[in-house]
Design a protein with these regions (language model features):
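Cytoplasmic juxtamembrane regions at transmembrane-helix boundaries
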Residues: 34-37, 115-158, 216
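An almost-null, non-specific background feature
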Residues: 10, 68, 72, 94-95, ...
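Hydrophobic core segments of alpha-helical transmembrane domains in multi-pass membrane transport
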Residues: 49-65, 128-134, 163-169, 198-202
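Generic alpha-helical secondary structure signal
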Residues: 8-14, 62, 90, 164, ...
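Haloarchaeal acidic low-complexity proteome signature biased toward cell-envelope/secretome components but also
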Residues: 1-55, 145-147, 208-216
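Alpha-helical transmembrane segments of multi-pass integral membrane proteins
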Residues: 3-5, 139-216
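Long, glycine/tryptophan/cysteine-rich extracytoplasmic
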Residues: 50-122, 173-190
């Protein structure tokens, strides 16, 4: 006769530390799992990781532009690199003449001016994915948890898009009575999409790394 060991109750599983071996949270009822992650997930550090990923991506792009000079327009290099960074997220930079506020906005795209546009498009995605993987490995050390990956992607994506929206007020340039700045609607759409997708994928990659480490 086979004797089964007693299984932990839902309450015992929920109170167990994140990542503890033998805790099968995916078997818990959905409402219990949601409550668990809302109460225990490190939301603020995840938001901060999203902030940091955006800043790191911008600094990395700025260093790349300085090391390998691109044919960007002269002057206001930090602002123009910021425009390029937003362009890499598929966000257009719009310009409205201050003399005619109701005129049709113009657009600015620096990607055609660089040698390899695809490389610059990949840069923010790679930085954000790696940041999410590292965050998962250090702060949310769980294995095979879709809930953890979604929570990480949502939190980091929110932090990422919030600082990107703030950046639309910082990265502005007035040229010949035309005020240029990244599109805020485009920032909400594309940057949030980048944050969610790369945040989830990075978290799943971090979980794979955790599984590999535990097997060795």
């Amino acid at each position: 006769m086979t004797v089964r060991e007693p299984r932990a109750t839902d309450e015992e599983r929920v109170t167990a530390p994140v990542g503890e071996a033998g805790v099968e949270r995916e078997e818990l009822p959905l409402d219990v799992r949601v409550e668990f992650w809302l109460e225990t997930f490190p939301w603020f550090p995840a938001f901060s990781a999203g902030f940091g990923a955006f800043l790191l991506g911008y600094v990395g792009l700025f260093a790349t532009v300085v090391a390998a000079p691109l044919s960007l327009p002269e002057g206001d290099l930090p602002i123009r690199v910021g425009f390029l960074f937003y362009n890499a997220h598929n966000v257009v930079v719009t310009g409205v003449t201050t003399a005619l506020p109701d005129s049709v906005p113009m657009t600015m795209d620096y990607l055609p001016l660089v040698g390899d546009p695809l490389l610059y498009r990949f840069l923010p995605a790679v930085v954000l994915t790696v940041a999410s993987a590292l965050f998962t490995f250090v702060r949310v050390p769980v294995r095979r948890s879709t809930t953890a990956a979604v929570a990480t992607g949502a939190a980091m994506g929110t932090g990422y898009v919030l600082i990107a929206l703030a950046g639309t007020f910082v990265f502005t340039l007035n040229v010949d009575n035309v005020l240029y700045q990244p599109s805020r609607a485009g920032t909400m759409l594309y940057v949030l999409g980048y944050g969610l997708l790369c945040g989830v994928c990075g978290s799943l990659s971090g979980q794979v790394a955790i599984s590999v480490v535990h097997r060795t």
